[in-house]
Amino acid sequence: MVLKFFRWLFRLLFRIQVYGDTGPLTQQRVLITPNHVSFLDGALMALFLPVRPVFAVYTSISQQWYMRALKPLIDFVPLDPTKPMSVKQLVRLVGEGRPVVIFPEGRISISGSLMKIYEGAGFVAAKSQATVIPVRIEGAELTFFSRLKGLVKRRLFPRISIHILPPTSIPMPDAPKARDRRKMAGEMLHQVMMEARMAARPRETLFEALINAQKRYGESKSCLEDINFKPDTYRSLMMKTLFVGRILDKYSAPREAIGLMLPNASISAAVIFGAVMRGRIPAMMNYTAGVQGLTSAITAAQIKTIFTSRQFLDKGKLWHLSEQITSVRWVFLEDLKGEVTAKDKAWIFAHLLMPRLAQVEQQPEDAALILFTSGSEGNPKGVVHSHKSLLANVEQIRTIADFTADDKFMSALPLFHSFGLTVGLFTPLLTGAEVFLYPSPLHYRVVPELVYDRNCTVIFGTSTFLGHYARFAHPYDFHLVRYVVAGAEKLQESTKQIWQDKFGLRILEGYGVTECAPVVSINVPMAAKPGTVGRILPAMDARLVEVPGIEQGGRLQLKGPNIMKGYLRVENPGVLEAPAAENPQGVSEPGWYDTGDIVAFDEQGFVQIQGRAKRFAKIAGEMVSLEMVESLALAVSPEKMHATAIKHDAAKGEALVLFTTDPELTREKLAQQARSKGVPELAVPRDIRFLKQLPLLGSGKPDFVSLKKLVDQEETHHA
């Protein structure tokens, strides 16, 4: 009777909804594993699960007075994770057919993300051979019973949902020592809990996600700042978004791809969200690609209009682009302010009260945004992402990293770069964190100073950029930083070492591709391993396809919610080419994406990048990684830049050409380093060419297309 009353009361106050199949809860040998976000979680499980479970309650809590008062109403057993007998008792209860609820985190989350998972919970699941049923509680973290004070906008009676996820199991790991088996079982359960979070994520568009972030963190919460040093709150960002969206209606049609050539600035974020709100598809134009690269992108995506800024073209010395590219209409943001009518203002203020009504009808699976590949190996391709794929990647990042509303991101990578867009804009905005948008990653003295001045806690970039920041920074500039993330190129040992020695900070290396929105794997404090790029993100499937001549690893293929909708190619403008990849049996499977990267997995699931499949040379029948050659050069000359290309060789098929900015780099020095590292002599180039400056892409990566042209020109000249 008491439970029935509280069930009615909770349903009335919190409008509780239970989703998922409750049938598996009545099976034999059931272990229920909810996330833990508030003091209400135990009551929610007791009141709304269709079974009467036994709760495993940690000893420190079970001895409290309120737990003794609840003893007549619920069954619980004290759990001391340091004592094996506690675990044995739970295994026995599961074996007897009693459903057991255990909170694997062992404590209420203080970040909103998953905390560490205690190994004992995973070991109970494996030892008892239980059916594991993950449960995801959403909304309770917004109550005053959570521990997220100051991180979310807490309220009296938020809506709470309980998601019962499909059952799974955890097999007993194969390891000689019990300690290792416990650890591995705990890691398996951690993976289950992360997959549960991904499975329970809401279906929403980018604009709806922004609205929900505003509601969750408060409209007066600062979320965005740029070099004007006038922070935007969620409310002021929403105002700008509505303004831009209203004006874009006059210059474009629904479902039209519109080019955006804008710097890292607050208004750029408003333009992106304003465009998707009104059903336009922003195409992020890479202004460093030059006239030829931009023309290819415009053709592939069938872009008719590019929105930019006069001030941006002035400061970036980019007027030649608008003068030479005449196939599109150029619209300048400065001109739009004068076009706002009284009717427009009324529309904007009305929708500021009800922003959801400003969004045109669309689905999460619809195309939301177009990015372009770097063009490092040919013409840029348009990569079409849906709302779902972009938001899935944000949620994957939030699932493994404990970013909170207390964090502040320094985002200097351009927004046309997938790394800069997803990690540098969408992730902080939708996590309640603040982000400082800076227009250039090349200002090596300014960026560290701004990290210090604006109290940033998260910084990310390529290995090249991070190395330069470290050299120019004061040892105290990064005293508040807790996450340093490297991606887009291989992390160099010298960069890693200077960050550790000078600032006491560990760089967390990740791996991503534009087609995956972009993050695929990343090292995080709870799961990091030197020499790897972390584990594959939750909700993704990965497989390796054998490559002839490559002994270790294979071509990485991926499938998951963050995979693109497809390519737009200049050869077939406007036609979407959906992803598909040949499986190991040679059959093309839709939905899979072939990265073209050669990787290997270690026994713990960490990813080791061997190189691009296209960046291997076949010399005298042996496969040689061009990245390995560049690593040799960096080991000899860490302060300079090096890049390898391939040329034809009549005797051996192919030969290596090393371009370097070090005039004193010789083959003898490289050969000596190769011998010390056990690298075969085939990997030591005979053709070494000095350049004062390597041609670079906007991301800071070497422009291999330009380097290959240099090689081809010389071969043509000698021919």
UniProtKB/Swiss-Prot annotation:
EC number(s) stated in the UniProt entry for this protein: 2.3.1.40, 6.2.1.20
A matching Pfam family: Acyltransferase
Localisation: Cell inner membrane
A GO CC term assigned to this protein in UniProt: plasma membrane
Key words, A-Z: Acyltransferase, ATP-binding, Cell inner membrane, Cell membrane, Ligase, Membrane, Multifunctional enzyme, Nucleotide-binding, Transferase, Transmembrane, Transmembrane helix
Bilayer-spanning residue ranges: 258-277, 409-433
Cell membrane is among the record's keywords: yes
CDD domains the record matches: LPLAT_AGPAT-like
Region (AMP-binding): 233-646
Chief localisation class: membrane
Reactions mediated catalytically: a 2-acyl-sn-glycero-3-phosphoethanolamine + a fatty acyl-[ACP] = a 1,2-diacyl-sn-glycero-3-phosphoethanolamine + holo-[ACP]; a long-chain fatty acid + holo-[ACP] + ATP = a long-chain fatty acyl-[ACP] + AMP + diphosphate
Family classification: In the N-terminal section; belongs to the 2-acyl-GPE acetyltransferase family. In the C-terminal section; belongs to the ATP-dependent AMP-binding enzyme family.
PANTHER family associated with the record: LONG-CHAIN-FATTY-ACID--COA LIGASE, NONRIBOSOMAL PEPTIDE SYNTHASE PES1 (EUROFUNG)-RELATED
NCBIfam families: PRK08043.1 (NF005959)
UniProt-recorded name of the protein: Bifunctional protein Aas
Originating organism: Cronobacter sakazakii (strain ATCC BAA-894) (Enterobacter sakazakii)
Name of the gene this protein is made from: aas
